[in-house]
């Protein structure tokens, strides 16, 4: 891939793991970041020394080959309107934010070359599950450029825009549902006598293999559970499911309205 310029408006956690993943796979990127709080973008540029900090200067960020909107939903409109005068005619905009539709982004930015992309943290190691939805006016050649840049970050299913908030709840936020449980298992392993490395390896391998079984032929939930004779959590499973379901429903409703 020829050298590409990339701008990020917003320099928080998502920007950081996106850049980490991009630099793992691409060596010819010129990345500039900006943030309404210049201390945030400066901190990121100090941690990732290949990144240029534009502070609050929108001009260079807006004219990049790829402009990533990496802002929390309440800040997206203001951020887009602030950078709109500087967006280049060639610039492809990729929004990482839930809630803000392609139609709204187009109105705020004054461009139709827009895609929405929902990354998750595994993007940082090239194993993300990151759906993309295309604006109706983005050309196939521009879509190819986006795929070329982002496919190295993990799976990139092309989905209907109306489903992106569901992906945000289940994929982007999904690790935060699992990691506390897995971390508690690792801690328990150490408490029972394993070394931290032994316990982490055990739990990691167990979790990966268990996840792989979800898509294995003939291994639906009931079949998988029936394979294990001892089920220590059976007496609280329905309570846990109820709490979990209520939380997921609340998050999804918040993002979808």
Where are these regions (language model features)?
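Internal alpha-helical scaffold of NAD(P)-dependent oxidoreductase catalytic cores
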Residues: 86, 104-113, 129-167, 177-215
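Conserved phosphate/anionic-ligand binding catalytic regions in large, soluble enzymes, centered on
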Residues: 170
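Small-residue helix-packing motif on alpha-helices
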Residues: 41, 60-61, 76, 195-203, ...
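A structural micro-motif
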Residues: 4, 29, 51, 91, ...
């Amino acid at each position: 891939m020829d050298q590409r310029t990339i701008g990020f408006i917003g320099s928080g956690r998502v920007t950081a793991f996106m850049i980490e993943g991009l630099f793992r796979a691409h060596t010819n990127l010129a990345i500039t970041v900006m943030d309404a709080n210049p201390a945030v973008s400066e901190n990121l540029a100090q941690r990732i020394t290949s990144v240029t900090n534009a502070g609050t200067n929108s001009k260079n960020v807006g004219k990049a080959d790829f402009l990533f909107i990496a802002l929390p939903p309440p800040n997206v409109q203001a951020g887009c309107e602030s950078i709109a005068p500087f967006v280049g005619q060639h610039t492809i905009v990729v929004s990482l934010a839930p809630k803000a539709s392609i139609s709204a982004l187009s109105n705020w930015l004054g461009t139709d070359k827009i895609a929405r992309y929902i990354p998750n943290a595994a993007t940082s190691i090239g194993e993300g599950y990151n759906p993309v939805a295309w604006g109706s006016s983005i050309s196939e050649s521009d879509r190819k450029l986006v795929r070329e840049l982002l496919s190295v970050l993990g799976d990139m299913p092309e989905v209907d825009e109306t489903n992106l908030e569901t992906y945000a709840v289940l994929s982007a936020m999904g690790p935060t549902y699992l990691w506390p449980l897995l971390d508690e298992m690792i801690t328990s392993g150490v408490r029972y006598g394993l070394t931290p490395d032994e316990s982490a390896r055990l739990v990691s391998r167990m979790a990966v293999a268990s996840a792989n079984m979800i898509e294995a032929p003939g291994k639906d939930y009931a079949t998988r559970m029936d394979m294990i004779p001892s089920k220590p959590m059976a007496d609280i499973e329905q309570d846990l499911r109820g709490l979990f379901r209520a939380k997921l429903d609340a998050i999804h409703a918040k993002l979808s309205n």
